[in-house]
Swiss-Prot record:
It is an enzyme of class 5 (isomerase). This is Glutamate-1-semialdehyde 2,1-aminomutase. Its EC number is 5.4.3.8. It comes from the Bacteria. SUPFAM superfamilies: PLP-dependent transferases (SSF53383). It catalyses: (S)-4-amino-5-oxopentanoate = 5-aminolevulinate. Homodimer. Belongs to the class-III pyridoxal-phosphate-dependent aminotransferase family. HemL subfamily. Pathway: Porphyrin-containing compound metabolism; protoporphyrin-IX biosynthesis; 5-aminolevulinate from L-glutamyl-tRNA(Glu): step 2/2.
């Protein structure tokens, strides 16, 4: 047995499923998850000594690559001053100033510890600000594991939501309406059925949890218009896309102005950080200035703030996003060329430093139904053969891939060459 197999066997006796987040268990592709010993640049190194070109990037945060010296040094320096104070620090002010400068739609920002905390708190704030209970989310989008978000559509387009996890009371789920991503007609229908009850729409501007599905040109502006028409708030969940699709996020890339924005992943530079912010009048409703309660023992932790501050300063340097786009475009084009040579039907979506690989005969993938029609079994074989080639992709057909500026063009070309060999075996 490999060391990863031994560790996984031991972990399953002590940790549910052997992992601390379900997708890591390889349940989406089968087999034994790799246990990682270290990471540097564009590479992961497992406990058995094998190196992999990494396109997971810790599920998004590692836009600069692993173990970036500026972030590592900032963490070490901050740790020497203390680990946590439970009191305000100068770095929190500097971090808030930096974030609000980089994302102009955020007049104010509140730091939390995860993307789930950010979305959960933003929805509570939207409900408190509007005095309404219902929310709209989209089929195939994921916004963390808060009860009100673990909801699937009912049997009809306008039925009340149903829990998709045991432990979520139906009374919670009934306030969540699930519409079809990239379909404004379904959203208008929900508003027309509940015109005075919907507090907010929450949306991934690029859906990254049904692989990678960009918005159609009219979709995000249409959501903005519907929110304005019916008096609801628009929450854009930029936990994945923030500082990755563009410096000011996908909202800037696509030209839409939200009322609230949720951030995570890159904002922490690899440390557990989330944030939410937006319009000053909305944020003023948050405690202690307003009645909507939110708190956190480790929110604004000095080490996490130092890591995030260092990361965002690096991400803000000229050329970062152009490099991400160039590398991702080359990877997408190369994979499509290699698949065509092997007569493998393939669609590769990509935006900025995100991409998605779909085994499908369809010309495009634009919604949840398109994603579910893809050949998941072929993806599983593709994943394991690429892993044997030393390429680490997301272990699920429903998760986006992430590029970093630490990837070289040689890494990209080697990945394409590996895919060419793998396609010949599929």
């Amino acid at each position: 047995m490999s060391k990863s197999e031994n560790l996984y066997s031991a972990a399953r006796e002590l940790i549910p499923g052997g992992v601390n987040s379900p997708v890591r268990a390889f349940t989406g592709v089968g087999g034994t998850p790799l246990f990682i010993e270290k990471a540097d640049g564009a590479y992961l190194y497992d406990v058995d000594g094998k190196a992999y070109i990494d396109y997971v990037g810790s599920w998004g945060p590692m836009v600069l690559g692993h173990n970036h010296p500026a972030i590592r040094n900032a963490v070490i320096e901050a740790a020497e001053r203390g680990l946590s104070f439970g009191a305000p620090t100068e770095m929190e002010v500097k971090m808030a100033e930096l974030v609000t400068n980089l994302v102009p739609t955020m007049d104010m920002v509140r730091m939390v510890n995860s993307g789930t905390e950010a979305t959960m708190s933003a929805i509570r704030l939207a409900r408190g600000f509007t005095g309404r209970d219902k929310i709209i989310k989209f089929e195939g989008c994921y916004h963390g594991h808060a009860d009100c978000l673990l909801v699937k559509a009912g049997s009809g387009a306008l039925t009340l939501g149903q829990p998709n996890s045991p432990g979520v009371p139906a009374d919670f789920a009934k306030h969540t309406l699930t519409c079809t991503y990239n379909d404004l007609t379904s959203v208008r229908a929900a508003f027309e059925q509940y015109p005075q009850e919907i507090a907010c729409i929450i949306v991934e501007p690029v859906a990254g949890n049904m692989n990678c599905v960009p918005p159609l040109p009219e979709f995000l502006p249409g959501l903005r218009a519907l929110c304005d028409e019916f008096g609801a708030l628009l929450i854009i969940d930029e936990v994945m896309t923030g500082f990755r699709v563009a410096l000011a996020g996908a909202q800037d890339y696509y030209g839409v102005v939200p009322d609230l924005t949720c951030l995570g992943k890159i904002i922490g530079g690899g440390m557990p950080v989330g944030a939410f912010g937006g319009r000053r009048d909305v944020m003023d409703a948050l405690a202690p200035t307003g009645p909507v309660y939110q708190a956190g023992t480790l929110s604004g932790n000095p080490i996490a703030m130092a890591a995030g501050f260092a990361c965002l300063n690096e991400v803000a340097q000229p050329g970062i996003h152009e490099t991400l786009d160039e590398l991702t475009t080359r990877l997408a084009e190369g994979l499509l060329e290699a698949a065509e040579e092997a007569n493998i039907p393939l669609v590769v979506n990509h935006v900025g430093g995100m991409f998605g690989i779909f085994f499908t005969d369809a010309e495009s993938v634009t919604c949840y139904q398109d994603v579910m029609a893809c050949d998941v079994e072929r993806f599983k074989r593709f994943f394991h053969l690429m892993l044997e080639e030393g390429v680490y992709l997301a272990p699920s057909a429903f998760e986006a891939g992430f590029m970093s500026v630490a990837h070289s063009m040689d890494d990209i070309n080697n990945t394409i060459d590996a895919a060419r060999r793998v396609f010949a075996k599929l």
